Amino acid sequence: KPLGAYLEQQLGMKVEFTPVADYPAVVEALATDRLDLAWLGGFTFVQVRLKTGNAIPLVQREQDAQFTSKFITANPDVTSLADLKGKTFAFGSVSSTSGSLMPRYFMLQDGIKPESHFSRVGYSGAHDATAAWVQAGKVDGGVLNASVWDKLVASGKVDSNKVKVFATTPTYFDYNWTVRGTLDPALAEKIKAAFLALDPANPEHKAILDLQAASRFIETSPENYKGIEDAARAADLLK
C-alpha cells in the first residue's frame, strides 16, 4: 500500500495493485499487457523475458545483486552435503530461484545430482515450509532463500538451537521490479527514478523500503540474469 501511494505521487497517475495467484500467472499477465509492473524472482523474470522478448528489469534491492540460499539441517552430525548422502532433502517451490533452481545448479556444479545423492527429494512449496519440514524431522536437510531464513530466525518461527545452516551457496542475482516491454519508455524511466529516489534517511521512504526488506534500490539489467537462464537450461526447466 505505501509503495502504491508513493508511486501515484511520483508518477501523477493512479496505481492499482493486482494480486496474482502464482509464478505462471505473473508471466502470463505481463505477456498479455494485463500488468505493467511486477516484482519477480530471477527465474520468473527469465521466463517473462523469453516469453515476451522485451520485458525490462528496472531495479533490484541492493541484496538482490548478491543473493544466496542457505542449506539447513536439524542433524548435528551434518556439516556438508556429502554427509546427507542417502538421506532425505527438500527444495521449496519447483520454480523458485532461491529455493530450487540456483541451489540445484550449484550442487550439479559440485558433482552432486540431487536425485541420486539423496534417498528422496521433496518440494515443500515455500521457503518457510522447507524450514518447518527440517525442524519437524520430515526431511534430513533442505535449502531456502537466505533472507527468509534470517526472518524466520529473527521472528522465532524456527528454533536455531535445533536447526542450523551448514552451507551457503555462491551469490547470484535474484528479485527485481520489471515492466512490460510495451510500456511507454518515458513512463518506465519515471518508475525507475521513483524507486532509485527512495532514501532510507527519509522516514516515509524508510517505511516503504522496510516493507520490501530493502536497504535501497539499485539499477539492474537483463544481462545480470544470464546465470539464472543457464541454470534453468541445465535443469531442463526452459523449453
Predicted segment positions?
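An extracytoplasmic/periplasmic, membrane-proximal ligand-sensing/linker region
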Residues: 1-2, 174, 178-239
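Short helices/loops that flank or line small-molecule/ion binding pockets
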Residues: 24-38, 51-52, 82, 126-147
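Immediate post-signal peptide segment of exported/extracytoplasmic ligand-binding proteins
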Residues: 9, 80-88, 231-239
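Hydrophobic/proline-rich hinge and linker segments of small-molecule sensing/allosteric domains
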Residues: 58-80, 177-180
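Extracytoplasmic small-molecule ligand-binding "clamshell" domains
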Residues: 1-43
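Pocket-lining segment of extracytoplasmic ligand-binding domains
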Residues: 77, 87-186
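Short beta-strand-centered segments that line the small-molecule binding cleft or hinge
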Residues: 36-38, 46, 53-68
